Amino acid sequence: LSDDAIYKFAKRKGYLSGDTLTDQKVAKKVSEASKELISTALKFATYLRENVTVSDWNWETNDYSYSVSGRGVVKNNTKYAIPDVKYVVTYMKRDGTEITQDGGRVTYDEIRPYGMESFSFYTSYVGNASHARIRLEFDDEFILETVAKGEYE
């Protein structure tokens, strides 16, 4: 956690109000603020996972090299411009055993509020994968800063 994010959050939420705080009281208040910041950040991360989704995605194998290419669309159903969104594709055998994972960035730009962004991917070896799943990952710094600034409560 960035000290700056915790301090912004603590100040904004009133943890550091008053000018009679001793060093020990400040440390205790910052610790309390840190716990609340983490709790709220986890809620925001869950909100993003539920409201920023991959749709219309597919993949196909090359029979000769066991490689895969695919594409998809990320829908941002939030009011936030979201930077640095990454995807992780997990390839599995018929019995559900994982073979490999691959990942990358959806885009180097932000995904606009209520916008969509298409992406494509290539994985050099997936063996005899019969199915795959995909998930998105969001930038921790973006999540903490958004919560610290009070843009998500």
What are these regions, as identified by a protein language model?
Residues 30-71, 152:
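Low-complexity, acidic Ser/Thr/Pro/Gly-rich terminal tails and inter-domain linkers that flank the onset
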Residues 34-40, 101, 121-153:
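Terminal connector regions
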Residues 74-78:
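Asparagine-centered strand-capping/turn motif at beta-strand->loop junctions
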Residues 81-84, 98-99:
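Short acidic/proline- and small/hydrophobic-mixed sequence motifs that coincide with surface turns
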Residues 86-89, 104:
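Hydrophobic beta-strand segments
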Residues 91-101:
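Short aromatic-acidic-glycine turn motif
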Residues 107-116:
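Short proline/glycine- and polar residue-rich coil/turn motifs
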